[in-house]
A protein has these predicted regions:
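Cytosolic covalent-transfer regions centered on His/Cys nucleophiles
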Residues: 1-145
Length: 145
């Protein structure tokens, strides 16, 4: 999984689940990865309404499939204080991986979700991300994996 500085927001300013998603969608728009931010936001919120993507141990992976992207895109956000994301363990989420794919990209979408799960199983990896102060540091952490 490749990360570059343009898709990373650290720290997130959002305080609510919808605001986190909006902020990360805006990151993708500014990075030139999507054009129709509102439609992408709605697709992610629709998916969230089906079941929260707040996992455990401070990890959230909001994701959706929509025709409003041309390929698989990722945005990363860090909130050191944490945000209520309706997580499975009831704890605030601190690391956010927003993943958007086309409906035809089921395979790559699942592979990306699996890669995020693999990386975030490492408490050291998560600790490094949480201690990062800049997008550049996050890119370096991903590059070392």
């Amino acid at each position: 999984m490749r990360a570059h500085q343009g898709i990373i927001k650290i720290p997130l300013e959002a305080k609510t689940k919808p605001d986190v998603i909006k902020e990360l969608v805006d990151v993708l728009k500014k990075a030139g990865k999507i054009e129709d931010a509102e439609s992408v936001f709605r697709a992610v919120m629709l998916r969230e309404n089906m079941g929260s993507t707040g996992l455990e141990k401070g990890i959230a992976v909001p994701h959706a499939k929509t025709h409003k992207v041309n390929n698989l895109v990722l945005a990363i956000g860090v909130s050191p204080e944490g945000i209520d994301f309706d997580s499975l363990d009831g704890e605030p989420s601190k690391l956010f991986f927003l993943l958007i794919a086309t409906p035809q990209q089921a395979g790559p979408h699942i592979e990306a979700l699996s890669e995020i799960a693999r990386l975030t199983r490492s408490s050291n990896f998560c600790k490094l991300l949480l201690n990062a102060k800049t997008p550049k540091e996050i890119v370096e952490i991903f590059s070392a994996q």
